[in-house]
């Protein structure tokens, strides 16, 4: 998903000193006095002002057919949850990428110092396999494919499974008259039958469990409205239905729920998973004869697959575990027969899923049928409690997602639109579905003060940089809060040349502040891509961009150990201070970091003061 230039994302900017016609090239004691007056503290004399680390990863055992290989950094930020408790919000950032690789490759990376982990990834046959980097090494050897797991699956005995009349209910939608005179019924087996039907599942390894958490919740972040990402997958509405193959059981395993059970009335624990199915040609024939597809789908029998209160603990929350599986049963077409045992699914059926929310808290405001196919949610999405999700007409309640070659269905069962309330693994006899989540590249921001006696708003020149792949780096000049004539050197691009004056590149005069004054006209960045060596690093001083102040005849480079912070390279989507605002007032933890970079507020740049940043 594309991010706006000045929205807080995980990228990096280069901050430079404030620009104005004040200041001069004075002696170092004058500079030191100015720094102390501006910041009000004494900085660590051994501070190197570095927020970044670098390394090389050896990736081996790359599967045949891999189209590219990437490196990702896992980063986190502290946020407050609904109970005002601190928890970590994670993100994955792409660091480097290589194509046309063989069975092994070495990739160089730069990453924020405070990263939690580095992952190597290989794209193979529409899936993204990932390995945690340990001691600079990632090995893909010995990967067990979904096909191998599928061959190992054992078909259950369907012959004793029958529908139970006392487990037939009129849907909430039908009770509310949403289908007019028509009635909609939900069918299921007895509670005892489900207890017999459940099978013990092979648990995930500790490493896969960690990968699941890191990937899923970096993409579907908690309490973040993720509908846009759902729609980008294109696996919504009529595309949300997997197609049965008839050659293996279809197995569904609940692996996660998060509903703050004790606070909100055990929402998931009180709910059930249902499914329904049809043949595409039957639906097509119905529509061809003048029928409506939504009416057809609503009229299909809905069968209970999993009573969540038999699987999850009543207060279980935010726990990833695959411990039990339920095989979907084919009950025939048309009106259900209570006396006919179930069968394995034949080929050629499309399967849809629905969660029947029936929490006892605030009922019936929080009760209703929630469909993966958004076309069936045009009433429930406007029902008293559910309407606060803002999913609107046709808003889906579920999305497919791959973690490696395993397939998961992620449900939004409540109102916060984060699509991580219930997560189910679906495997076996269905055609492959591929949706690999994409993550933003890591960015670095170079921020410079253009004069020695600066105001340290660190926006005199701001450069955003990102590594596109092994041999390509992109630089963008995104802001210039200075009146001096300035040049960006050491980029050596087609546009950002050593002798190119920054204001001229934006087509404005030198008495113009560029993207540093709130409410002023925003100008598009000036961007260049340059070719670099495979061992390139943003930490290499020989290849780092720096500023030449033509007016003062001075070069401004990134700050070194013991110097004042006149040039800093910052990771993530850093938002630079607005004009004439010292960085300590835009980021209240900056001074703590400046006094002891090894201990204090090493992630200060994640917490801006909104009114003081651009």
Question: Which stretches of residues belong to each language-model region?
Answer:
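C-terminal motif of bacterial Sec signal peptides marking the signal peptidase cleavage site
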Residues: 15-17
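Sec-dependent N-terminal signal peptides
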Residues: 4-13
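Extracellular distal adhesion/interaction modules in secreted or cell-surface proteins
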Residues: 21-614
């Amino acid at each position: 998903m594309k991010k706006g230039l000045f929205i807080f994302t995980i990228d990096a900017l280069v901050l430079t000193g404030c620009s104005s016609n004040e200041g001069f090239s004075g002696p170092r004691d004058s500079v030191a006095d100015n720094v102390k007056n501006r910041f009000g503290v004494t900085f660590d004399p051994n501070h190197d002002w570095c927020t970044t680390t670098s390394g090389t990863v050896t990736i081996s055992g790359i599967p045949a057919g891999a189209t590219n290989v990437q490196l990702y950094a896992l980063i986190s930020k502290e946020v407050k949850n609904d109970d005002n408790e601190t928890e970590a919000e994670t993100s994955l950032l792409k660091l480097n990428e290589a194509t046309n690789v063989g069975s092994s490759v070495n990739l160089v990376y730069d990453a924020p110092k405070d990263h939690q982990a580095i992952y190597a990834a290989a794209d193979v046959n529409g899936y993204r396999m990932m390995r945690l980097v340990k001691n600079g090494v990632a090995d893909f050897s010995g990967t067990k494919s979904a096909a191998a797991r599928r061959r190992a699956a054992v078909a259950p005995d369907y012959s004793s499974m029958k529908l139970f009349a006392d487990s037939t209910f009129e849907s909430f939608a039908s009770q509310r008259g949403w289908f007019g005179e028509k009635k909609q019924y939900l069918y299921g087996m007895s509670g005892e039958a489900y207890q017999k039907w459940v099978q013990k599942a092979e648990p995930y390894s500790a490493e896969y469990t960690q990968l699941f958490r890191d990937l899923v919740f970096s993409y579907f972040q908690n309490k973040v409205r993720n509908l846009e990402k759902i729609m980008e997958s294109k696996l919504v509405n009529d595309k949300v239905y997997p197609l049965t193959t008839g050659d293996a059981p279809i197995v569904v395993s609940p692996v996660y729920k998060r509903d703050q059970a004790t606070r909100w009335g055990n929402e998931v624990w009180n709910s059930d998973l249902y499914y329904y199915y049809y043949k595409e040609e039957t639906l097509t024939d119905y529509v061809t004869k003048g029928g409506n597809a939504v009416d057809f789908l609503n009229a299909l029998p809905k069968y209970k697959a999993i009573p969540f209160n038999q699987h999850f603990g009543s207060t279980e929350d935010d726990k990833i575990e695959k411990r039990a599986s339920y095989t979907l049963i084919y009950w025939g077409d048309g009106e259900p027969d209570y006396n006919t045992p179930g069968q394995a699914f034949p080929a050629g059926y499309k399967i849809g899923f629905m969660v029947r929310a029936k929490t006892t808290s605030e009922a019936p405001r929080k009760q209703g049928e929630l469909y993966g196919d958004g076309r069936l949610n045009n009433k429930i999405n406007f029902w008293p409690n559910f309407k606060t999700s803002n999913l609107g007409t046709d808003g889906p309640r579920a999305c497919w997602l791959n973690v490696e070659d395993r397939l998961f269905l992620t449900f939004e069962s409540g109102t916060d639109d984060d699509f991580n309330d219930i997560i189910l693994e679906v495997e076996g006899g269905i055609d492959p579905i591929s949706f690999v989540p994409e993550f933003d590249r890591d960015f670095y921001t170079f921020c410079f003060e253009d004069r020695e006696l600066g105001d340290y708003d660190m926006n005199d020149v701001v450069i955003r940089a990102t590594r596109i792949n092994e041999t390509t780096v992109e630089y963008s000049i995104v802001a210039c809060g200075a009146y001096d004539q300035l040049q960006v050197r050491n980029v050596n691009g087609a546009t950002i040349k050593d002798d190119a004056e920054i204001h001229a590149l934006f087509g404005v005069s030198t008495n113009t502040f560029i993207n540093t004054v709130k409410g002023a006209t925003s100008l598009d960045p000036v961007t260049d891509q340059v070719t670099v060596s495979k061992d390139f690093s943003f930490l290499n001083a020989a290849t780092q961009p720096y500023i030449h102040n033509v007016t003062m005849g001075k070069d401004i480079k990134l700050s070194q150990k013991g110097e004042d912070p006149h040039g800093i390279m910052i990771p993530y989507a850093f938002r630079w201070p607005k004009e004439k605002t010292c960085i300590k007032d835009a980021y209240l933890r900056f001074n703590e970091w400046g006094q002891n970079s090894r201990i204090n507020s090493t992630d200060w740049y994640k917490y801006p003061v909104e009114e003081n940043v651009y």
